[in-house]
């Protein structure tokens, strides 16, 4: 049985600095936090030029609704979705960064809540998904930028705007979605008419699912990145 309280043995990048360390690396970690928090701050406010500054050329992002796309295509899809009524916001809850001793590669994990507003059949409600962003950063010519951004989707829920009005949920259909983002996936497909990825990284407790496998893979990928390997984005 999977150990629910521990990460995969050996997945910790032992040579990386995670806190304390030299003041110079603490400053770099502060820069990386600013970049990571830029995703929700810039995207939610439609500050697209600022949003672009997070990435290096050739970077990719993965989300439930977009799949794997180049960051420029993600921006274009976000704009198109907003014009069709998609209303997605984020709340940040803290971050941590592992950085290599040379100060050239880092992985920043940002705890956040994705909150998406839906209106179905006269019922207005939010779906909130607790997640962690995972940014793979690299410093080139003195500037940090993301090469890859993925998420762990850990748990979600529905919140009615008016408790007297709540939409009907098809319980059988709901069971087909991943445990970490089942309501988000259900309503993105039902209300937005899109196909959601069902194999996004989840939580350690999602035993017997591909989402647990992807959870662990993301940690191993971070270790390889911090140890200088080339990774497929």
UniProtKB/Swiss-Prot annotation:
Family matches, as SUPFAM superfamilies: NTF2-like (SSF54427)
One Pfam short name: SnoaL_4
Bias (Polar residues) ranges: 1-12
InterPro entries: NTF2-like_dom_sf, SnoaL-like
Residue numbers spanned by region Disordered: 1-20
Purpose of the protein: Contributes to the ability of the fungus to cause disease on pea plants.
The family this protein is said to belong to: Belongs to the PEP2 family.
Name the record gives this protein: Pea pathogenicity protein 2
Organism, as annotated: Fusarium vanettenii (strain ATCC MYA-4622 / CBS 123669 / FGSC 9596 / NRRL 45880 / 77-13-4) (Fusarium solani subsp. pisi)
